[in-house]
């Protein structure tokens, strides 16, 4: 278990990478933008991007409408 910061809030997680974290949080791939320690990531980068204790994640849910 590691402690990371997600959207400014501390959170304990067992996720080993960004893809696992996105799934753990219930987001749908393609419906969320992810920034990891200040770097914006493409969804193709999520599976290989390891999470470490103290990392900072910003998530932005995309919504369409009119």
Set out the residue ranges of the language-model regions.
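Ubiquitin-like/PB1-type beta-grasp interaction modules and other compact soluble beta-rich domains
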Residues: 1-65
């Amino acid at each position: 278990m590691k402690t990371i910061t997600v959207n400014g809030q501390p959170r304990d997680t067992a996720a080993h990478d960004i893809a696992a974290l996105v799934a753990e949080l219930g987001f749908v791939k393609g419906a969320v933008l992810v920034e990891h320690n200040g770097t914006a990531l493409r969804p193709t980068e999520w599976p290989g991007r390891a999470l470490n204790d103290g990392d900072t994640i910003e998530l932005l849910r995309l919504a369409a409408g009119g």
